[in-house]
């Protein structure tokens, strides 16, 4: 009876902690917030750049899961590496995006993220 009680209490604690953490990534910015960040970045605001990057980390994980499922099935280390490399592409996108050209940031960022991952994978294959 005590072990059953311990089991129930442990699971309640786990559920409580899980609900408290909600998400490992910040919520995505609204279109207005995103545009405001992009305008501030164009004016040289480093804090706006960091906010834009942090709020698009979930997008990097989505692209890795969608475009590189073989790496996700391989090991968590492979997935973490691809997300890290994809984040470098996201940083590049945040620094070079031009809103006046009419495209959405997510469209531009997806290409930058994918290019960073593809470039790194080609570089690794050269040394194998």
Which positions does each model-derived feature cover?
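Alpha-helical promoter-recognition and RNA polymerase-docking modules of transcription initiation factors
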Residues: 4-127
